[in-house]
C-alpha cells in the first residue's frame, strides 16, 4: 500500500516538474514560426511554453540547451506523402526509424511523428494492412527504447480554397476511426495518434466528441486558429478553453502544440495571445 502511494507521488511529482501545476504542456511547432530555433525557444520560455514541437535531428541539442523539451521529433520520415500505407517506401522507412529510434532514446525524446502517406489505389482495409506490415517491425525497438511512434491525423479534403497547400489529397489517416483501427491492429502502447485539431475540424469532425471517444489512443495534439490557421484569437469559431478543459477532464497529460501556418511577422504577440487563450488567462 505504501509502495503504491509512493509510486503515485513520484508520477505526480514528475508531471509537476515538467509542466508546473498544469498536467498539459504547451509546445511551439518549429516550422510554424519563421525564426531561428534558439530565438523561438526564448519566446517559448517568455510566454509559458515548455517545449518545441516537430524538431529535426540537428536542432535537438539547441532545444535541450535552452532548457526546453523536444515534444515531438521530426525529420525521420520521408515526407507526409510517402508513408506506411505504400509498401514501396517500407524498406527505407523501416531503415530510417530503426536507425534513429535509439538516438531519440539517448536524447530522452519520447515521441516521433510518422505518416500514413497518400493512398490512391488501396481500400481502407488494404491500406490498414500495409501500415501494419510497415510499422510492426519497429514496435519492438520502440518499446525497448520507450519511444512512441505517433501517426498524425491530417485533412485530405480536396479544395481550391486558399489553404489547400496545408491539406493533403488522398492522405489515408484522415479520420480517427481509421487511426484507432490501426492502433488496435498494432496493439502496442508505443503506437499512438497525433490529433490535429485544425485538420480534423477541416474534415468536419466534432472535435469534442472525438476526444471523448478516442482520447486513450491519442498521445499528442496540434492546434491552430480556426478556420484560417493563424494564431489563436478570441474571435475564432472554436472554443479553445473548452477544448483544454476537456483534455484535463479525460486525464490527458501531454503536450498541445501550437501550429499556425508559417508566422513571419508579430511572432511574439501571436505566441503570447495563443498561449494566453490555451491557459485561459
Question: How should each PLM-predicted stretch be described?
Answer:
Residues 1-21:
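Bacterial Sec-dependent N-terminal signal peptides
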Residues 19-25, 30, 34-45, 108-111, ...:
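Histidine-acidic metal/acid-base catalytic patches
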Residues 22-30, 35, 42, 47-133, ...:
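Structural motif corresponding to the early beta-alpha repeats
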Residues 69-73, 89-90, 130-131, 168-172, ...:
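Short, hinge-like loop/turn segments at secondary-structure boundaries
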Residues 70-72, 151, 195, 258:
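Hydrophobic residues in well-ordered beta-strands that form the structural core
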Residues 77-82, 119-121, 156-158, 224-230:
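Conserved radical SAM core fold
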Amino acid at each position: 500500500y505504501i509502495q503504491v502511494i509512493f509510486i503515485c507521488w513520484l508520477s505526480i511529482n514528475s508531471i509537476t516538474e515538467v509542466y508546473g501545476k498544469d498536467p498539459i504542456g504547451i509546445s511551439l511547432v518549429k516550422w510554424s514560426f519563421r525564426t531561428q530555433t534558439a530565438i523561438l525557444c526564448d519566446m517559448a520560455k517568455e510566454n509559458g511554453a515548455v517545449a518545441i514541437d516537430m524538431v529535426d535531428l540537428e536542432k535537438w541539442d539547441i532545444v535541450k540547451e535552452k532548457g526546453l523539451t523536444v515534444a515531438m521529433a521530426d525529420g525521420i520520415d520521408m515526407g507526409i506523402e510517402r508513408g506506411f500505407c505504400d509498401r514501396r517506401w517500407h524498406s527505407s522507412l523501416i531503415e530510417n526509424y530503426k536507425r534513429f529510434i535509439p538516438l531519440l532514446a539517448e536524447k530522452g525524446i519520447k515521441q516521433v511523428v510518422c505518416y500514413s502517406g497518400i493512398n490512391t489505389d488501396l481500400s481502407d482495409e488494404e491500406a490498414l494492412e500495409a501500415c501494419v506490415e510497415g510499422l510492426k517491425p519497429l514496435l519492438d525497438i520502440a518499446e525497448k527504447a520507450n519511444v512512441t511512434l505517433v501517426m498524425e491525423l491530417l485533412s485530405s479534403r480536396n479544395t481550391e480554397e486558399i489553404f489547400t497547400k496545408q491539406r493533403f489529397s488522398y492522405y489515408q489517416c484522415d479520420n480517427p476511426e481509421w487511426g484507432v483501427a490501426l492502433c488496435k491492429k498494432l496493439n502496442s502502447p508505443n503506437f499512438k495518434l497525433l490529433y490535429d485539431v485544425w485538420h480534423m475540424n477541416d474534415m468536419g469532425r466534432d472535435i469534442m466528441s472525438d476526444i471523448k471517444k478516442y482520447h486513450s489512443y491519442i498521445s499528442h495534439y496540434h492546434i491552430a486558429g480556426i478556420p484560417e490557421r493563424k494564431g489563436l484569437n478570441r474571435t475564432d469559431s472554436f472554443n479553445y478553453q473548452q477544448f483544454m478543459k476537456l483534455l484535463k477532464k479525460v486525464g490527458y497529460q501531454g503536450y498541445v502544440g501550437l501550429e499556425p501556418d508559417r508566422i513571419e511577422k508579430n511572432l511574439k504577440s501571436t505566441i503570447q495571445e495563443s498561449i494566453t487563450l490555451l491557459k485561459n488567462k
